[in-house]
Amino acid sequence: MEQNPQSQLKLLVTRGKEQGYLTYAEVNDHLPEDIVDSDQIEDIIQMINDMGIQVMEEAPDADDLMLAENTADEDAAEAAAQVLSSVESEIGRTTDPVRMYMREMGTVELLTREGEIDIAKRIEDGINQVQCSVAEYPEAITYLLEQYDRVEAEEARLSDLITGFVDPNAEEDLAPTATHVGSELSQEDLDDDEDEDEEDGDDDSADDDNSIDPELAREKFAELRAQYVVTRDTIKAKGRSHATAQEEILKLSEVFKQFRLVPKQFDYLVNSMRVMMDRVRTQERLIMKLCVEQCKMPKKNFITLFTGNETSDTWFNAAIAMNKPWSEKLHDVSEEVHRALQKLQQIEEETGLTIEQVKDINRRMSIGEAKARRAKKEMVEANLRLVISIAKKYTNRGLQFLDLIQEGNIGLMKAVDKFEYRRGYKFSTYATWWIRQAITRSIADQARTIRIPVHMIETINKLNRISRQMLQEMGREPTPEELAERMLMPEDKIRKVLKIAKEPISMETPIGDDEDSHLGDFIEDTTLELPLDSATTESLRAATHDVLAGLTAREAKVLRMRFGIDMNTDYTLEEVGKQFDVTRERIRQIEAKALRKLRHPSRSEVLRSFLDD
């Protein structure tokens, strides 16, 4: 008999309280059928953990379980005392976001090397579970092989498809000596003058110590293709549920697990499965709405009949044959229900999977995602202090401290995604470089009002460093010529870099002790005429009018038209002649006579003072 979701969850919690723990397999078996979203599964696991029930990969030993039971009350009391003391000491003291963030961050314990490996394994297990689920979706393997064919045809890059391969036979090498050396190197570099950070790792391939071997990739993809063909043929011949087919599917999953896909490609495959599941949900909800809400068919009866017969109309015919009050109403929605069933059949044909198998694959994929996401969250929260310690060294660079922390956290999350515990280094040694890269990149992109490209930032940092060295050597600031000689660069490029390196300054910057005037008040407006020039022009205009007033009206008008005084333009002799209906020669004579009058000392003296020396 089908149990409702509440009773299934209650049974799961009861079992967990009896055992003191739950495994992921038990959670998967007891989850309701309609819960397939990774966020929902993660919320349920979080709720179970909050109840004091640990969710583990596998059942613990009896001795470990007894020890955990004996110390549970003591641990709870100690944890409660720590929380109470921290609350009493901090309550009412501050609402500063940074302090509140640090206070909450301080409640998370630091990880040991073994703890880091344990979390990294959980992340890997979660991702492997997702990949194994995706491997059962034929279209996913087909897509991956098609993308590799594009790589072989030189239409795409191999690095855009995979980041490497996981060796299933590789042993864990803790390499304690290498860990200490790496830690010392990273700390030593962090203590250096931060101006020398020339954007460590310009691209996002800071962890790609070795490029992907094309021959190895060709061999791995050939193995994947061969196993895919065998699996596909076996399923066609014997059916997916046959033991041989299941064995071949398992082999295909093991081969597919060895591929470390680029996040973009991995997300595409996962999303394609999720889109397929959304299509199934849409049709199932439509059918349930028609039968349960519209025809008033009891939900319990619908679930009993529909589950397991998603693409067959036998359940619908059986429901009509039950001769219940709602059975007659089903005839009215028969056409719409059959249309939805046809769409579900179409999904089965597209995927080569039954609806039940699509749900099962999506369910296991969601649990794997939730498991990996939870482990990543633990790793990030345990290393937030590292981000703070690095961000402190980049203050006063143009970004607020909280912004630096957030950018560093983004780098930390990227480091968690790319961390490989098998290389033997501590996570903090590896994450340092991702955090520094994220912070320095954000400063280069956001700190300045006018963004400067990263390569130019590097040149400016190098110029500043050499400039300081030369200042110490010579006791004075070096000239552009000296900098050009030392840096082996053209002098004009040095001057250009020096000009670009200048920081913008606000027009509202106060000037003087009283701060009643601003920098903008002292900047010349080149678009307007100077007050002196404006006054001179106005005086010249008035003097010209006075002088022309001493001439006859005809002479004054001829001069105004010839020289464009108080007019938009000047006129030729021909144009002026037409205005007065006389010849151009006569206009020339009138103009000459008027100018002779103006040259008289009594009139010219007024205008002579405006001539430039």
Curated annotation (Swiss-Prot):
Primary location class: cytoplasm
One Gene Ontology term of the molecular function aspect: sigma factor activity
Q: Which GO terms describe its biological process?
A: DNA-templated transcription initiation; negative regulation of DNA-templated transcription; regulation of DNA-templated transcription initiation; response to heat
Extract the ranges annotated as region (Disordered): 176-213
Pfam families for this protein: Sigma70_ner (PF04546), Sigma70_r1_1 (PF03979), Sigma70_r1_2 (PF00140), Sigma70_r2 (PF04542), Sigma70_r3 (PF04539), Sigma70_r4 (PF04545)
List the keywords (alphabetical).
Cytoplasm, DNA-binding, Sigma factor, Transcription, Transcription regulation
Q: Does the keyword Cytoplasm apply?
A: yes
Q: Note the Gene3D superfamilies from the entry.
A: RNA Polymerase Primary Sigma Factor, Sigma-70 factor, region 1.1, Winged helix-like DNA-binding domain superfamily/Winged helix DNA-binding domain
Q: Which residues bind DNA?
A: 573-592
Q: Which family does it belong to?
A: Belongs to the sigma-70 factor family. RpoD/SigA subfamily.
> What subunit structure does UniProt give?
Interacts transiently with the RNA polymerase catalytic core formed by RpoA, RpoB, RpoC and RpoZ (2 alpha, 1 beta, 1 beta' and 1 omega subunit) to form the RNA polymerase holoenzyme that can initiate transcription. Identified in a complex containing RpoD, the RNA polymerase subunits RpoA, RpoB and RpoZ, CRP and DNA. Interacts with Rsd; this prevents interaction with the RNA polymerase catalytic core and with promoter DNA, and as a consequence, promotes transcription from promoters that require alternative sigma factors. (Microbial infection) Interacts with Escherichia phage lambda antitermination protein Q.
Annotated protein name in UniProt:
RNA polymerase sigma factor RpoD
**Species:** Escherichia coli (strain K12)
Gene that codes for this?
Answer: rpoD
